[in-house]
């Protein structure tokens, strides 16, 4: 990849990163465990729609699974994101030691809120870069 292409991609990421940080924060604030991420998937679907992706929901019969697609030709680039919270990992944000919001509650102690939003930002940047460069 050329330096120019790399700079273009980073500029695309930088232009949208605040919106995706806000997405990660909203998901963090609503910790939902595996197969129960109903609000989190709504947040991701809303972002996919805003970014112009075609959306398939209820993938493999899972109401919290979603696919976003862009373009009509190959090659196909797949990026996996996840946004489930984990039981017992409730945690105040920005605190390095264990400090649960709710003792024994669910939380994003492993950063899955970040995995989902970062994967979606990466997919958006690639989509936008391909649209710009052909």
Regions found by a protein language model. Give the residues of each.
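Acidic/His- and Gly-rich active-site-bordering loop/insert found
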Residues: 3-108, 113, 117-134
């Amino acid at each position: 990849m050329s330096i120019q292409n790399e700079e273009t991609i980073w500029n695309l990421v930088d232009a949208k990163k605040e919106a995706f940080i806000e997405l990660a924060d909203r998901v963090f604030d609503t910790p939902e465990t595996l197969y129960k991420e109903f609000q989190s998937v709504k947040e991701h679907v809303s972002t996919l729609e805003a970014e112009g992706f075609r959306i398939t929901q209820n993938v493999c019969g899972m109401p919290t699974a979603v696919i976003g697609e862009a373009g009509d030709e190959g090659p196909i680039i797949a990026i996996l994101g996840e946004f489930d919270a984990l039981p017992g990992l409730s945690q105040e944000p920005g605190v390095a030691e264990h400090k649960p919001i709710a003792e024994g509650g669910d939380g994003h102690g492993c950063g899955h809120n970040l995995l989902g939003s970062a994967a979606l930002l990466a997919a958006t940047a690639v989509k936008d870069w391909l649209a710009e460069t052909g």
